[in-house]
Amino acid sequence: ANTLNVGESGLAARLFTPIAALGGEAMRIEGEGTLRHRPMAMMVEPLRTLGVEVRDGGGRLPIEVHGPIKGGRVVVDGSISSQFITGLLIALPCAKSDTTIEVRDAVSTPYIDMTLETLERFGVEAMHNEGDYSEFYIEGNQEFTAIDYTIESDWSAAAFIMVAAAIAGEVTVRNISTLSHQADTSVCRALERAGAAIIIEQGATSVSHRPLEAFTFDATHSPDLFPALVA
């Protein structure tokens, strides 16, 4: 089998495994470090249901997939991460058959919105009822259209700098938009609750220190903010 080593990236593992299953050859997905101990079992049965041969290491990497992925009806556990759902939404438009994905307990739903918006930009459609992430319908045999695309700045990375400024300084982060679908834009709301000063302008957000206080924040849909906010 060919090998794809994703390093320590959980996103790459969950995103590229269903994409790798589009081909007709076996592909072994490997990882390094702590990624080898992170849960991947949520991918195994859905991929098998979609016609992929899967050999897994007890719900952990490495995982070997042998496609092609065929489509059909599949149930996916969305309670751990939306990353695998994103991988399916990217891969399944290229399957030979139509697919219905039933998602149970979806988290990080803003990232699903980002995926759907990006697919649309590339000429691919995955249908669902707005605000409802429990079911998606994807026609097979779609084709991606090549376009020029500008990748947004990363709010997950910016959050650490903004939190540092709230604790002991001042910073202006440019070329980021609070209108983004990225879930981590909510770091601004969290810092405001903590008492930091936030100024939002077009294309830039400024954060400066003020006396901070305890606050409550639900990170269900923005888990990447948790390490920064606990500071």
Predicted regions and their residues:
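Short, structured segments at the rim of ligand-binding sites
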Residues: 1-231
